[in-house]
């Protein structure tokens, strides 16, 4: 392990309040277990509280076994994707739950392990997979076309220099395979200048984009929101913490639509969907951010936003096609490929 600080769950006080922890025992799903920060806080809120903790990363599940043993049956660890949380929970014999919390983003454990290939701050193999199977970041960087790379970096990383980054990657590929995080960070830094005074590394947005693409993070998020809707009892709460605008946009659209407003997936899908039966009421009227004290104490919290809703007794509506459109790369035919 490096000298990085341990994982601190962000907006913990606000998440506790949104989930009404401490108001009696119940069953809460932590759909993004990670280092276990939220799970521990949920369990500590009430001696009768139970948690089903889900993570697709086998390392996170293995790390949590000590906590599960100490909780004497109150913590159930399940390896799987949080986009399938309703199926995973029902496989444990539980039909409905009282709360679901999702912390969307890479965990500090993953960033802290150079061999996982998530961070440009430590040299390691260019991987970024949250589970062992599937396409790695190295596969994507070395095999995708210039246009595909530019689209991924522009839309998932919101990198204005996406076309230049993609071109630089293609030029570097001609000299040999791009295999490490340090090599890729160097390539990106050769064409993206640091923003004065921002403290943001030039490779930040490109690494974010590749991680999102490799793990289908936005697709998983929109599936998880619908899965939580299906598993929550009436009166149950869903709390979602996001860290960048792409994630927050999906969560905002979901809660807006499910609380009775028509939504659109932006200019790429201009026709708004008609309001469905209100399956949620809003617990937070807008995003809740960190206090100044928390942002100072925990830099990871600076960009965090919390949105929460309470499940009504309305029937489960059809999934929102607008969310799937937000999670996908816009098609070039609709003009999504322009830079």
From Swiss-Prot:
Its EC number is 2.1.1.199. Gene3D superfamilies: Putative methyltransferase TM0872, insert domain, Vaccinia Virus protein VP39. Keywords: Cytoplasm, Methyltransferase, rRNA processing, S-adenosyl-L-methionine, Transferase. This is Ribosomal RNA small subunit methyltransferase H. It catalyses: cytidine(1402) in 16S rRNA + S-adenosyl-L-methionine = N(4)-methylcytidine(1402) in 16S rRNA + S-adenosyl-L-homocysteine + H(+). It is an enzyme of class 2 (transferase). The lineage of its organism: Bacteria, Pseudomonadati, Pseudomonadota, Alphaproteobacteria, Hyphomicrobiales. Its main location: cytoplasm. It comes from Methylobacterium nodulans (strain LMG 21967 / CNCM I-2342 / ORS 2060). The keyword S-adenosyl-L-methionine applies.
